[in-house]
A protein has these predicted regions:
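Hydrophobic alpha-helical segments embedded in the membrane of multi-pass proteins
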Residues: 90-102
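Membrane-interface helix/loop boundary segments of multi-pass membrane proteins
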Residues: 37-64, 78, 102-110
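Aromatic-anchored segments of alpha-helical transmembrane domains
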Residues: 1-5, 65-74, 119-128
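C-terminal membrane module of polytopic membrane proteins
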Residues: 112, 117-172
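Membrane-interface helix termini and inter-helical loops of multi-pass transporters
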Residues: 7-18, 47, 75-82, 130-138
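Membrane-helix interface segments
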Residues: 19-20, 54-58, 85-86, 107-112, ...
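Hydrophobic cores of alpha-helical transmembrane segments in multi-pass inner/ER membrane proteins
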Residues: 29-39, 97-98, 148-161
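Juxtamembrane helix-entry segments on the extracytoplasmic side of multipass membrane proteins
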Residues: 13-28, 77-91, 142-144
Length: 172
């Protein structure tokens, strides 16, 4: 959401007012349809198992690729996702997966940070429409570099907090 606030002045179109009720509905809707169920599987089941086998970073990238495939059917129906350039969405999936995987690893395996980050990601994409990014590609493009920096910061944070590079074959 901080990225959204930083990029808001660069939005191509004017803002749209949003009510507190609309925000509450969006939070509930987004929580139930995405982060709760998905993160129970992605982090609750896969991340820990894969972390032990291939390292947290490789596990996060693999989960990011699976996450992308999981969302591909949304491009075959009339949905907001169908308007997003697939390479942009793929980059977001991979970067978010690294950030979420880092939070999961630093937290000692709690899925709560994963759920909260995933929820925030979904809400930022939804709120970007109200902030003037009517074309989802504008938001996905504008937020790509800040996300890359956050992902690199997350990798560094895991390394400095745990000593884990996250890539099994690089471990000495």
């Amino acid at each position: 959401l901080a990225i959204l606030l930083l990029l808001k002045p660069f939005a191509p179109e004017g803002t749209t007012p949003i009510s507190a009720g609309m925000v509450a509905v969006m939070i509930g809707f987004n929580l139930i349809l995405g982060p709760l169920g998905e993160e129970l599987g992605w982090r609750g089941l896969f991340q820990e198992h894969l972390n032990q086998r291939i390292g947290w970073l490789e596990a996060s990238l693999l989960i990011g690729a699976i996450w992308l495939v999981w969302h591909l059917p949304l491009w075959t129906i009339d949905s907001p996702h169908a308007q997003i350039a697939l390479p942009l969405f793929a980059a977001h999936c991979m970067l978010y997966s690294v950030i979420i995987g880092a939070a999961y690893t630093i937290s000692g395996g709690s899925i709560l940070p994963a759920i909260l980050i995933h929820l925030t990601v979904n809400l930022a994409a939804n709120f970007s429409i109200f902030a003037g990014f009517k074309d989802p590609n504008a938001w996905f493009s504008a937020s790509l570099v800040p996300l890359l920096l956050l992902a690199l910061g997350a990798i560094s944070l895991v390394y400095f907090r745990t000593g884990q590079l996250g890539v099994r074959w690089l471990q000495v």
